Regions:
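Long, compositionally biased interface segments
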Residues: 186-236
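Short, conserved charged micro-motifs
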Residues: 21-27, 82-84, 123-124, 204-215
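Aromatic/basic-lined ligand-recognition segments
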Residues: 109-197
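Short glycine-rich, low-complexity/disordered patches
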Residues: 41-52, 97-118, 138-159, 223-236
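Internal, hydrophobic cores of structured domains that mediate oligomerization or house catalytic pockets
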Residues: 66-142
Length: 236
């Protein structure tokens, strides 16, 4: 059976770090009102140098944020693989539409996915399967279309200007609740599963408009799900 994103527990975090934008401090309220008026993220809160957004007071599945040094979006267990990209881009475009906001040059574009897919195996059984079937370096090259730079418990790859760091392994539910960011979804965490932590990043990409962000986000989001699917198919 192929990996069904609706049956996994996951969290996806986009963070775009840029050079300091001091004027953000003066326009926090303007950004809050403008983005809230668009309708996707109407609930906001302001701290010293940051504005956080949510779809509602009760909804903890999504968070958008903008500060004097970064802008980003978080989605927990999206309904589809495309959901993260579409929601994040709508939020970013809502912020960019504020006339007084201008994002400085980007110093780091990062996208991190933590994915836990369930298994019917015991922990010992899944560990045995993992030791027998874990992808070899050549297979990882094909999965990511990238060259391995380091290999061990953590694998580091590079595709063009994009770096990829991957770690994964069998995990019991209690460990997932306390040692990963998935603990916020503790009611959905299985007793045993295979955990993957996939980090894509690019340093100093310079100026980025919404089209460049959308293209790169689409690439790394697809790459993360492709990796999760490959591991799922190999192990289960």
């Amino acid at each position: 059976m192929p990996l069904d994103e609706k049956n996994v527990v996951s969290e996806h975090v986009l963070e775009i770090r840029h050079r300091a934008f001091g004027r953000l401090i003066d326009i926090r309220g303007l950004i809050a009102d403008a983005v809230a008026a668009k309708g996707q993220m109407p609930v906001w809160s302001i701290t010293d140098s940051r504005v956080d957004f949510k779809p509602s007071d009760e909804d903890q599945r999504e968070v958008g944020f903008v500060s004097h040094r970064n802008i980003g979006y978080v989605v927990r267990s999206p309904y589809t693989r495309q959901y993260m990209h579409d929601r994040a881009m709508r939020f970013i475009r809502d912020v960019f539409a504020v006339e007084e906001y201008r994002m400085p040059d980007v110093v780091r574009f990062g996208f991190r996915s933590q994915i836990l897919f369930p298994t019917r195996d015991t922990f010992a059984g899944l560990l045995k399967k993992t030791n027998e079937r874990m992808p070899l370096p050549k297979q990882l090259n094909e999965v990511f279309d990238a060259q391995i730079e380091d290999y061990g418990q953590i694998v580091v790859l590079k595709r063009g200007e994009t770096h990829i760091r991957l770690r994964g392994g069998p995990m019991e539910g209690e460990q997932a609740k306390t040692e990963t960011s998935l603990g916020a979804q503790k009611d959905r965490i299985p007793e045993v599963g295979f955990f993957m932590d996939i980090d894509h990043w690019r340093t100093n990409p310079g100026p980025m408009d919404d089209r460049k962000i959308s293209t790169l986000l689409q690439q790394v989001n697809e790459s993360a799900w492709k990796a999760a699917s490959a591991y799922h198919d190999i192990l289960l």
